[in-house]
UniProtKB/Swiss-Prot annotation:
It is a peripheral membrane protein. The keyword Membrane applies. GO terms for molecular function: GTP binding; GTPase activity. One of its GO terms (cellular component) is ER to Golgi transport vesicle membrane. Its main location: membrane. It holds the Pfam family Arf. It catalyses: GTP + H2O = GDP + phosphate + H(+). Keywords: Cytoplasmic vesicle, Endoplasmic reticulum, ER-Golgi transport, Golgi apparatus, GTP-binding, Hydrolase, Membrane, Nucleotide-binding, Protein transport, Transport. Small GTPase component of the coat protein complex II (COPII) which promotes the formation of transport vesicles from the endoplasmic reticulum (ER). The coat has two main functions, the physical deformation of the endoplasmic reticulum membrane into vesicles and the selection of cargo molecules. SAR1 controls the coat assembly in a stepwise manner. Activated SAR1-GTP binds to membranes first and recruits the SEC23/24 complex. These SEC23/24-SAR1 prebudding intermediates are then collected by the SEC13/31 complex as subunits polymerize to form coated transport vesicles. The keyword Transport applies. This is Small COPII coat GTPase SAR1. GTP binds at residues 48-55, 91-94, 151-154. COPII is composed of at least 5 proteins: the SEC23/24 complex, the SEC13/31 complex and SAR1. It comes from Encephalitozoon cuniculi (strain GB-M1).
């Protein structure tokens, strides 16, 4: 009897997760009114593939091009995303320069639990900023649950956030008049609550879309 109840609850949970994922997908799809090229960047195992799987709909294919196994592509409405691993040394990362052509926005993902690779994250992030100086950057500090945080407690933990910035070299810069804008969001991409259209992941895409729109209007003046 207990096994049947647990099985039923598991099915209900899976159905709810699927429903909320559909809602989240449609939310992101509705954001970008014009075609926008977005780069999903970060070192390997940061959570890029997990995020792409959360974003894509059943009708969207994610494929691996034959010329390089570290990139993949996805289209979600007007959002055209390239997912790129930025591993290796600085010299190797410079080879990614071509991917930044006609880039409208960047999603940079960090595994906050993988402390031993923060120096690699710092170097990758510095390379990204050196290759693209205009596009808005969303930074997703991912896997905060492994640090005992929710999005709310992470935002309130100023000491931890300051330490993260010191270790990774990543800081908020939200004034477009001062140059390239960067905004940090604290998330657990695998969490069911990450599908919420009011959660930090949704707010991250909404902010990115707003900054892309701002840049487009500024360029048209």
């Amino acid at each position: 009897m207990l096994d049947n109840i647990q099985e039923y609850l598991g099915v209900v949970k899976a159905k709810l997760t699927e429903f909320y994922e559909k809602v989240f997908q449609n939310f992101v799809k509705s954001l970008f009114g014009k075609p926008s090229s977005i780069l999903f960047l970060g070192i390997d195992n940061a959570g890029k593939t997990t995020l792409v799987n959360k974003l894509k709909s059943d009708s969207t294919d994610v494929y691996m091009p034959t010329h390089h196994p570290s990139t993949s592509y996805i289209e979600i409405g007007n959002l055209k995303a390239q997912v790129i691993d930025l591993g290796g040394h600085t010299a190797a990362r410079l080879a990614w320069r071509d991917y930044f052509y006609d880039c409208h926005g960047i999603v940079f993902i960090v595994d906050v639990h993988d402390v031993e690779r923060f120096q690699e994250v710092r170097e990758a992030y510095e390379t990204v900023l050196s290759l693209e100086k205009r596009a808005p950057v969303v930074v997703l500090m991912n896997k905060i649950d492994l640090e005992g945080h929710t999005p709310e407690t992470a935002e309130a933990d100023y000491q931890w956030k300051s330490w993260l910035s010191q270790e990774t070299g990543i800081e908020n810069q939200e004034d477009p008049e001062r140059g390239q804008v960067v905004k940090i969001f604290y998330v657990t991409i695998t969490s069911g609550s990450a599908n919420s259209i009011t959660g930090p992941l949704a707010r991250a895409f909404k902010w990115l879309e707003a900054m892309i729109t701002y840049n487009n209007k500024k360029e048209s003046l």
